[in-house]
């Protein structure tokens, strides 16, 4: 089966509605929690570790919901939203690879924030490098992620972990 290597905003919304990977399988969050506008490239080959990679983008709009509340007089995108975007992308990757179940973030190793996103910025880019992919009874991905704003790397997350679970009753 040939899988698409890029996804539009409409494709991502389809995934959020549960229409992409089938009932009971991974979904992306819907806006405003969907933290990217498109996946520009996804592959199960290549990347820094030869296990696959994902690239995605989000255009920054000065009226984005998070700027109004974080913080009204000093608007900045919360760092946790960038981190969540990386988990979202890793979960999407596992579903794209055919893994069944609902995605859940399981943690990360080192996380560094060395910059910020403000209403003056234009474009956030994400690059996820898969380190390990387990596609057995346990479906889990481990990856390193980088977030950049207007070409400058500002977030680094090592050992991001996401699993897919057929049942989340005991979670």
Swiss-Prot record:
Q: Which GO terms describe its cellular component?
A: cytoplasm
**GO BP term, example:** unsaturated fatty acid biosynthetic process
Q: Which segments does the entry list as coiled coil?
A: none
Q: In which pathway does it act?
A: Lipid metabolism; fatty acid biosynthesis
Alphabetically list the UniProt keywords.
Answer: Cytoplasm, Fatty acid biosynthesis, Fatty acid metabolism, Isomerase, Lipid biosynthesis, Lipid metabolism, Lyase
Q: How does it assemble?
A: Homodimer.
Identify this protein by name: 3-hydroxydecanoyl-[acyl-carrier-protein] dehydratase
Q: What is the species of this protein?
A: Nitrosococcus oceani (strain ATCC 19707 / BCRC 17464 / JCM 30415 / NCIMB 11848 / C-107)
């Amino acid at each position: 089966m040939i899988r698409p290597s890029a996804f539009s905003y409409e494709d991502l919304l389809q995934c959020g509605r549960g229409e992409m990977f089938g009932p009971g399988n991974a979904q992306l969050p819907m806006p405003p929690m969907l933290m990217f506008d498109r996946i520009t490239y996804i592959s199960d080959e290549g990347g820094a570790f030869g296990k696959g990679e994902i690239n995605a983008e989000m255009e920054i709009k000065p009226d984005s919901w998070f700027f109004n509340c974080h913080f009204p007089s000093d608007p900045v995108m919360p760092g946790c939203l960038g981190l969540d975007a990386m988990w979202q992308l890793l979960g999407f990757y596992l579903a794209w690879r055919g893994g069944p179940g609902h995605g859940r973030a399981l943690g990360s190793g080192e996380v560094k924030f060395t910059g910020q996103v403000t209403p003056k910025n234009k474009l956030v880019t994400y690059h996820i490098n898969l380190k390990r992919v387990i596609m057995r009874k346990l479906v889990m991905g481990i990856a390193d992620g980088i977030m950049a704003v207007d070409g400058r790397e500002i977030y680094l997350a090592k050992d991001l972990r996401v699993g897919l679970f057929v049942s989340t009753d005991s979670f």
